[in-house]
Amino acid sequence: RPDAAAAEEILARHLTADLPLDPAELTAHGGDREATAASLRRVVVEALYARNEATAVLEITEAHTVSGASTRVLHLADLTSGAMLAAIVSRAKTASIKDELAGGAGGLSAARLRLAVETEARQNEEITGATTPEGWARLIGTRTSQILSVRRLGKEST
């Protein structure tokens, strides 16, 4: 899984200065397309890599042979992949095209990217409900412990 710096590098391949950028975003960065694209990439990384209740996805209880059991929380960042990052940018591009066709400003914006992150997170919530503890062990790279339980976190778990 990419860390925040690696995620920003991956996003640099997908969210480039030559893409249509929201006019308000460009104005906020003095018309500098590179600075605008870099700022938008940071928006995505900050939304994905924040460690708070909004980004908490799963609570995993693992069995350990020596110490018993432990519980940890996985956040969006723990599940982020290059494919997810590309999908977020793609969703935001689609939203900007739809907005422009409807008479709006169009172009990539912080708001559209945050919405794309939220949509991708919801899609991951759907996946978490259909995956076994063994599948999660493979996904998160847990080989030294056995996953006893996986509990979905977020809006639907309260």
PLM regions and their residue ranges:
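C-terminal engagement/docking regions of AAA+ P-loop ATPases
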Residues: 63-158
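Conserved C-terminal "switch" segment of AAA+ ATPases
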Residues: 1-84, 95-102
